Amino acid sequence: MQFTQHALDGRDIILHTKGDSMSNFCYITDAVRAIIILMTQGDMGEAYNVCHDEETRSIASIANLVACHVGGDKVSVVFDIPENVSSFGYAPTVHMFLNSRKMRNLSWEPKVTMKDAYIRLAEYITEERQNG
């Protein structure tokens, strides 16, 4: 949300790490649909990954996506990494790649891309600011 707020304000997105951590993401409506499917079709005790397989991204790539699609040409991603970055307590770099094949076998598939998710978030924040 902070990336989006900065982009809407025309402020650069500042990263204090390389932003290398990667993970899959899933929009809330896609996750809720998956839960409903699992309640009716899932196997008791079985684990299922609910994720958008094609939306595996790093923090830096998310920042760039938001800068481009929310901030337009007025927002950049700036890396301001302190020399003693390890003393700040940032989470270690992780790479988590989930596979939603079992969910897809239940006829579930994600519908909302990360780009669309951030555009929706920007629209929501803008509306809240106007009504707030």
Q: Predicted regions: what is each one?
A:
Residues 7-132:
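C-terminal substrate-binding subdomain of Rossmann-fold SDR/epimerase-dehydratase oxidoreductases
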